[in-house]
């Protein structure tokens, strides 16, 4: 049973749950496990713009260096950039200090292995063992054997150049609005679009340590919708705090979510004979409309549990090269080993230019069923107990009977917050909203 690592690393409220002491122990235990005693380990460390990032970075690095790891800091940079730079710099591991789309008070620490993939479960469990018994680590290097720290000033440039190498199209004539969520993409995204020739308007690109994800970015695209219309832009692109996800807005100011972007990307790859096994990997949260569009266009779907971790596992295991989530995590495995919001946005812009049609027109290939998501706030320890209550089970069965095969109910505990997410999908939005709200209220009442 995991104690510290969740679905996306170790997360919590910075300085109370994710403390400096825990960050130090994560560095010390992680460095020791990854070293395996046979060579001097090199670790790439990046972060997003949260005020707690510097504090946790200092503690984490102290832990790593205390067991002889050499650390390459790359500063504020998207999570997928750390995955890429870990490979480019020949490091043994990469670490990101970020809580992605979560509010500023949260932070997280996530490890990548030398190939840019998330650590295997067994390694995370081994790290947890040492965290709980830190004195078992009998590694106290002295003198020249203590770890060194080096800051890589070219890290951002290296990532931008790599992204540009993937795109062969000139973006001249394309007007884009970028919502950087006051997060890790605030420099990289505008630079790469500008250097590819696009006309760029950036919003929420002035981080102050406290405004990351605040009423902006991929989880709050309303500001972007207004900006696209105000500037008469061709496209709006919203990232989250660590830029591992993307939500788009078409030229009419309408949201284009991960499902739409995935089906467009899959069709583009298939058209160019580059979609591995003609298969797109999605999660159970993807809209029924995506299933229909895929079937009509000869694209196979492989469906996993919610979480880009499970999408990636399926892709690697079965040799697929495209997968993602409705929330905007999209993995283009030919280019990177994790969700990459900036890469996804470049690929979407490239598709629009290749098709020579507005996004609203090309995205109409998929019709979206109404989908309602309501959160039930509960005690964290009760997240997985909802089916233990007969009243909740009975209400779910009642809703399924009402939908009668023309929709579905999906209940999912959050991997990072004290929430149970209730999702309903069906033909009539008013009906499913009422049903979802009632079910969420019942779950909250029983599990709070």
UniProtKB/Swiss-Prot annotation:
Chain positions with Phosphoserine modification: 100
GO MF annotation: an example: magnesium ion binding
Binding note for cofactor: Binds 1 Mg(2+) ion per subunit.
Gene3D superfamilies, sorted: Alpha-D-Glucose-1,6-Bisphosphate, subunit A, domain 3, Alpha-D-phosphohexomutase, C-terminal domain
CDD domains to which the protein is assigned, alphabetical: GlmM (cd05802)
InterPro entries the UniProt entry points to: A-D-PHexomutase_a/b/a-I, A-D-PHexomutase_a/b/a-I/II/III, A-D-PHexomutase_a/b/a-II, A-D-PHexomutase_a/b/a-III, A-D-PHexomutase_C, A-D-PHexomutase_C_sf, A-D-PHexomutase_CS, Alpha-D-phosphohexomutase_SF
Keywords: Isomerase, Magnesium, Metal-binding, Phosphoprotein
Domain of life according to the entry: Bacteria
Family to which the UniProt record says this protein belongs: Belongs to the phosphohexose mutase family.
HAMAP family: GlmM_B (MF_01554_B)
Role summary: Catalyzes the conversion of glucosamine-6-phosphate to glucosamine-1-phosphate.
Protein name: Phosphoglucosamine mutase
Organism encoding this protein: Clostridioides difficile (strain 630)
Organism ancestry: Bacteria, Bacillati, Bacillota, Clostridia, Peptostreptococcales
Gene: glmM
């Amino acid at each position: 049973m995991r104690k510290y690592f969740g679905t996306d690393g170790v997360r919590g409220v910075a300085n109370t749950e994710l403390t400096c002491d825990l960050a130090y122990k994560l560095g010390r235990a992680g460095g020791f496990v990854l070293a395996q005693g046979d060579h001097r380990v090199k670790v790439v460390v990046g972060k997003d713009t949260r005020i707690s990032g510097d504090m946790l970075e200092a503690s984490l690095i102290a832990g790593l260096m205390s067991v002889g790891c050499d650390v390459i800091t790359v500063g504020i940079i998207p999570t997928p950039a750390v995955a890429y730079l870990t490979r480019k710099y020949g490091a043994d591991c990469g670490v990101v200090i970020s809580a992605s789309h979560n509010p500023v008070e949260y932070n997280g620490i996530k490890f990548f292995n030398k190939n840019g993939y998330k650590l295997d479960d067994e390694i995370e469990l081994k790290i947890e063992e040492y965290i709980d018994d830190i004195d078992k680590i009998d590694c106290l290097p002295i003198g020249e054997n203590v770890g060194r720290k080096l800051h890589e000033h070219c890290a951002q440039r290296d990532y931008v150049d790599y992204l540009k190498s993937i795109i062969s199209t000139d973006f001249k004539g394309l007007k884009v609005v970028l919502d950087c969520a006051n997060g890790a993409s605030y420099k990289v995204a505008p630079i790469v679009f500008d250097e590819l020739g696009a006309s760029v308007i950036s919003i929420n690109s002035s981080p102050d340590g406290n405004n990351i994800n605040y009423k902006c970015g991929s989880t709050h695209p309303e500001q972007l919708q207004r900006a696209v219309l105000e500037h008469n832009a061709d496209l709006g692109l919203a990232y989250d705090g660590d830029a591992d996800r993307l939500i788009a807005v078409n030229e009419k100011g309408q949201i284009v979510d991960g499902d739409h972007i995935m089906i467009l990307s899959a069709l583009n790859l298939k058209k160019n004979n580059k979609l591995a096994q003609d298969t797109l990997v999605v999660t159970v949260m993807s809209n029924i409309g995506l299933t229909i569009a895929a079937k009509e266009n000869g694209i196979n779907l492989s469906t996993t549990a919610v979480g880009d971790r499970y999408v990636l596992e399926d892709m690697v295991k079965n040799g697929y090269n495209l997968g993602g989530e409705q929330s905007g995590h999209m993995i283009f495995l030919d280019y990177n080993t994790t969700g990459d919001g900036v890469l996804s946005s470049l690929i979407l812009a490239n598709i629009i230019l290749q098709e020579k049609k507005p996004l609203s027109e090309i995205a109409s290939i998929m019709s979206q069923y109404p989908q309602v998501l309501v959160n039930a706030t509960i005690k964290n320890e009760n997240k997985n107990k909802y089916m233990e209550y007969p009243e909740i089970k009975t209400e779910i069965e009642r809703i399924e009977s009402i939908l009668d095969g023309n929709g579905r109910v999906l209940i999912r505990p959050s991997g990072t917050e004290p929430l149970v997410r209730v999702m309903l999908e069906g033909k009539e939005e008013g009906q499913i909203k009422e049903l979802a709200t009632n079910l969420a209220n019942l779950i909250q009442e029983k599990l709070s």
